[in-house]
Amino acid sequence: MAGKAKFCAPEIQDNPDGWGPCSVPTAFKDIPYQPFSKADRLGKVSDWTGSVYQDRRYANKYQSQFGTGNQMFSYYHEEDETSFQLVDTSRTQRPGYMRNRNRFNQRGGYRRDNRGGRFQGQGGNMGMQNLSRGRDTRNKFQRKMQRNWGGGRHWSDKKTGGMHKRVASVTVREEWKVLEDGELDFPRLSKLNLPNVEEPETLYECGSVEYYDKAYDRVTTKNEVPLVGVNRVFHKVTTTDDPIISKLLSQGNVFATDAIISTLMTCTRSNYSWDIVVQRVGSKLFFDKRDDSEFDLLTVGETANDLNIDETSGINTPTNLSLEATFINQNFSQQVLKRGEVKTFDHPNPFVTDEDDSTVASVCYRYRKWDLGDGIQLIVRCEHDAIMQGPRGETCLVNIKTLNEWDPKMTGVDWRQKLDSQRGAVLATELKNNSCKLAKWTANSILAGSEYLKLGYVSRVNFLDTSKHTILGTQQFRPREFATQIALNMDNAWGVLRCIIDICMKQPEGKLLILKDPSKGVIRIYDIPNSTFETDEEDDDDDEDDVENDDGDDEKDEGDGED
């Protein structure tokens, strides 16, 4: 019995609080665990398999399902901000004669199974390089996905202002209060509809317009026409300063301009911040713009998701591009007209003074009235830019607008190469980048009753110079047909407008502010004091009164001296 082996019972670890051992041996302490799959193939020590297996079916043969997604033990070097510098990584456009040159070098060299070909040695290496380049591109995409999702950055940063910080058009003050039902999000507004809105009644027509020169319809990229600056006066008068609207107060209870109404109708497409002042006087509503606002400036690239435009972009900042686009639009709308051929309406332009009578821009104002139901009578001042002869010799009213090219490297489409042969692609790109602006123009034309909407394509002569431009072509649309092409639903537009009017009509007399949030798809309606935005005007009035009083005192003193 003494020579037999003795059985020693092993130590059993009982973990009453969970599953697994209670303690970790010192030999295995602090060893990280790498997740893996037993289905992975062995042979991953060096990842050279991408260039060996040129057939795409075997490109991911040894790729682990845990390999790319798990970055637990990856090494990340701390960023040294002192050595940070900006690098231009934008792709330069190749000249036409250098494009697709690799395609001809590979002819007969690389096939799927790498067999045959006159230049097989050279072409085979090219195929391996292409596969390696494909793997690098795939890895870059994976790293980008990890940064966007794993680093806390949302995929929709670009849509929510990730490219540059947008600011509100007006600073919200503490005493301003949002109405109880005054926060309207875009998804809810996009579901509203007001169908079967009757045709409007034209109450008043005034002004004079010139005829459109059809020679500009034949302009192409091969016979460009320089854009010439036109010295003409454009009146952008707000609603409450319009003398004609004051005469029509008895015929309606909601008053606005076409620019304000189209902004509200197409608000679900806007990304930039804007604001509109609403005044409730008795039973009437007046929609106004602020005097010191940028409401009348045209936006550029407002709805683009892939354009890196910010206030540090040199000449291509949002403010500079907006001023440039407005300058181009005004000059183009007057340059394409025939001098001397004028159509005068029944009443003169109400905003013209004796000083600028000879330099006023070609414009016709039509005051139109819509019945929106439930006692809502809307009167809008609409505008036409020109007049032209239709295909049957009839007289047609026209609205003239301009799209401008400022940098083809940013937009991805070179107008000088694509405008004549692929005009649809150019317009599609502009619709993607400037959807809100095009929708506003279309809504303006429909409100005014224009038969045609003329679009001009204007580009910089030198993309580093914002002072010289050239006309590359024009395009003509029927407003309602164009609204269908750009998916502008006028029933929804009327529904959005009616919803905002109803909310404002429920409020007592006073002043409201409609503000588009700069970073969210939301508009808010604030209740603001009646004296808001009027301090400067009151100060000016007080100064004028003081000057008049001083003059009166001086005259009195002079009279006393004579006595």
UniProtKB/Swiss-Prot annotation:
Keywords: Cytoplasm, Initiation factor, Protein biosynthesis, RNA-binding. Pfam families: eIF-3_zeta. GO terms for cellular component: eukaryotic 43S preinitiation complex; eukaryotic 48S preinitiation complex; eukaryotic translation initiation factor 3 complex. The keyword Thylakoid does not apply. Residues 294-308 are annotated as: RNA gate. It comes from the Eukaryota. Residues 95-136, 528-563 are annotated as: Disordered. GO terms for molecular function: mRNA cap binding; translation initiation factor activity. Residues 534-563 have a biased composition (Acidic residues). GO terms for biological process: cap-dependent translational initiation; formation of cytoplasmic translation initiation complex; translational initiation. It is found in: Cytoplasm. The RNA gate region regulates mRNA cap recognition to prevent promiscuous mRNA-binding before assembly of eif3d into the full eukaryotic translation initiation factor 3 (eIF-3) complex. Belongs to the eIF-3 subunit D family. mRNA cap-binding component of the eukaryotic translation initiation factor 3 (eIF-3) complex, which is involved in protein synthesis of a specialized repertoire of mRNAs and, together with other initiation factors, stimulates binding of mRNA and methionyl-tRNAi to the 40S ribosome. The eIF-3 complex specifically targets and initiates translation of a subset of mRNAs involved in cell proliferation. In the eIF-3 complex, eif3d specifically recognizes and binds the 7-methylguanosine cap of a subset of mRNAs. Component of the eukaryotic translation initiation factor 3 (eIF-3) complex. PANTHER family: EUKARYOTIC TRANSLATION INITIATION FACTOR 3 SUBUNIT 7, EUKARYOTIC TRANSLATION INITIATION FACTOR 3 SUBUNIT D. This is Eukaryotic translation initiation factor 3 subunit D. It comes from Nematostella vectensis (Starlet sea anemone).
